[in-house]
Amino acid sequence: MTNIRKTHPLIKIINHSFIDLPAPSNISSWWNFGSLLGLCLMIQIITGLFLAMHYTSDTTTAFSSVTHICRDVNYGWLIRYMHANGASMFFICLFIHIGRGMYYGSYTFMETWNIGVILLFAIMATAFMGYVLPWGQMSFWGATVITNLLSAIPYIGTTLVEWIWGGFSVDKATLTRFFAFHFILPFIIAALVIVHLLFLHETGSNNPTGLNSNADKIPFHPYYTIKDLLGVFMLILFLMTLVLFFPDMLGDPDNYTPANPLNTPPHIKPEWYFLFAYAILRSIPNKLGGVLALILSILILAFLPFLHTSKQRSLMFRPITQVLYWMLVANLLILTWIGGQPVEHPFIIIGQLASISYFSIILILMPISGIIEDKLLKWSL
């Protein structure tokens, strides 16, 4: 009798995706973050569902409904902080996952990579709208500042902003629609994840060398299921340490003050995972220019396959580009720091220099170093 795992129409799909999947024998721990992102998404959907049972998307009751969840609902505080800090874990895993793809040249899987870029935009949109829901000061002013950026679009800008707001300011209509979108988007993300995996399994996983690994494959289960399980335990340990000991470490104290349209907080800033993009936005004095730079700072990932000049896929054996890569990582950390600082000297100039170097490294220096390395190896024509 043949195994049901290999014959049942539904179980067969799971088998080919997570059990009998041929995987390269040499993929390192940097490949663990895909499964961790899946876990983060599941945590967010489950905790979010329970929060939605008690939350009310009305300007008069939103803030107090979140307070009610934390004070009166059984383990409501735990669910709320797991959801809030789960988003931070999601973005940590996301940045490492993208960084891994950039380092080892995974962007040459064009379809998988482009779906990934779309996923990044969708996750960022979801996180932004989720931050608005508690209706604290930073929620309100963050929503006002970021949605207002769309008014920089010529001709249709103002109309577009008022259409998104559902009025002439961020108000009840805005909160209600943000809640609706925040609820539906994770399910769209889950569908996109399936497409992401579908395209990935067409080609198979990349590996640290960037070379074809068809000659040396091992089954996903038990080798990588056990390896992923270690990552899962470490993620849960890190998340629960954050939730149970430092729940507000990554949040903003201003969000414990109910939203007040008549009182602007001294420093409006988004959550930490958006600070790098926020710093790039602020470093350009022109409004439209800032918005374009903001979008391009993420969209630039979609251009990586076209900026690849080397005959080698991975950076494993490319020391010059390796140095540039880690300069880019350091640069992003500087941008994240600057995004949280007030707009004054010396932060303005540091932010502008970091923004210039961010685009320069990706668009100019890395493609040039790829050509130089090929020449040094006498591989160029």
Swiss-Prot record:
Instruction: List the SUPFAM superfamilies hit by this protein, alphabetically.
Output: a domain/subunit of cytochrome bc1 complex (Ubiquinol-cytochrome c reductase) (SSF81648), Transmembrane di-heme cytochromes (SSF81342)
- The keyword Phosphoprotein belongs to this UniProt entry's keyword annotation: no
| Binding-site residues, heme b b562 | H83, H182
- Lineage, opening ranks: Eukaryota, Metazoa, Chordata, Craniata, Vertebrata
Q: Which organism is it from?
A: Apomys musculus (Least Philippine forest mouse)
One biological process GO term for this chain? mitochondrial electron transport, ubiquinol to cytochrome c
Detail which positions bind heme b b566: H97, H196
Query: Pfam families, from UniProt?
Result: Cytochrom_B_C (PF00032), Cytochrome_B (PF00033)
Which protein is depicted? Cytochrome b
Keywords assigned by UniProt, alphabetized: Electron transport, Heme, Iron, Membrane, Metal-binding, Mitochondrion, Mitochondrion inner membrane, Respiratory chain, Transmembrane, Transmembrane helix, Transport, Ubiquinone
Q: How does it sit in the membrane?
A: Multi-pass membrane protein
What more the UniProt record tells us is: Heme 1 (or BL or b562) is low-potential and absorbs at about 562 nm, and heme 2 (or BH or b566) is high-potential and absorbs at about 566 nm.
Q: Describe the function of this protein.
A: Component of the ubiquinol-cytochrome c reductase complex (complex III or cytochrome b-c1 complex) that is part of the mitochondrial respiratory chain. The b-c1 complex mediates electron transfer from ubiquinol to cytochrome c. Contributes to the generation of a proton gradient across the mitochondrial membrane that is then used for ATP synthesis.
